[in-house]
């Protein structure tokens, strides 16, 4: 898996309020061949950019700056853009996971995460999205 799923030039949006993590994600995704369209720290910015730019992947922290959290942002993005969303969070409590599940996310990674874990989760997210898109066309 991977080589045909993560093709060079796929566009990613990072929505993460911790600067060091956002930079690490930017670096890791770039190494995987992604073009980073933006790294923002609020749900509102993430929604605006995802709606305007229509990325191929969104990495979304759950706790963010601003009035909305990542789950709310993902829900709004999903209503407007068909894009795989991978949550990155330090929160694994039942309530958070249940809220996130309702947005039909494509991946959920607990921080801190390993490089291979990030890559495999992204590969699965892209594959799930491709299968969903194919089913919609049928």
Predicted segments — roles?
Residues 1-13, 126-138:
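Non-catalytic signal-transmission and effector/linker regions of two-component phosphorelay proteins
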Residues 68, 72, 79, 86, ...:
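Alpha4 helix (beta4-alpha4-beta5 surface) of REC/receiver domains from two-component response regulators
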Residues 95, 113-123, 130:
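C-terminal output helix
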């Amino acid at each position: 898996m991977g080589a045909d799923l993560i093709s060079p030039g796929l566009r990613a949006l990072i929505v993460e309020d911790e600067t060091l993590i956002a930079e690490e994600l930017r670096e890791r995704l770039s190494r995987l061949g992604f073009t980073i369209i933006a790294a923002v720290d609020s749900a509102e910015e993430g929604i605006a950019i995802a709606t305007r730019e229509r990325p191929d992947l969104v990495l979304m922290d759950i706790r963010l700056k601003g009035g909305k959290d990542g789950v709310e942002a993902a829900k709004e993005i999903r209503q407007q853009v068909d894009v795989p969303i991978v949550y990155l969070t330090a929160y694994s409590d039942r309530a958070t996971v249940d809220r996130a599940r309702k947005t039909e996310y494509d991946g959920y990674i607990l921080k801190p995460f390993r490089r291979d874990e990030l890559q495999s989760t992204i590969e699965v997210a892209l594959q799930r999205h491709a299968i969903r898109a194919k089913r919609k066309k049928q």
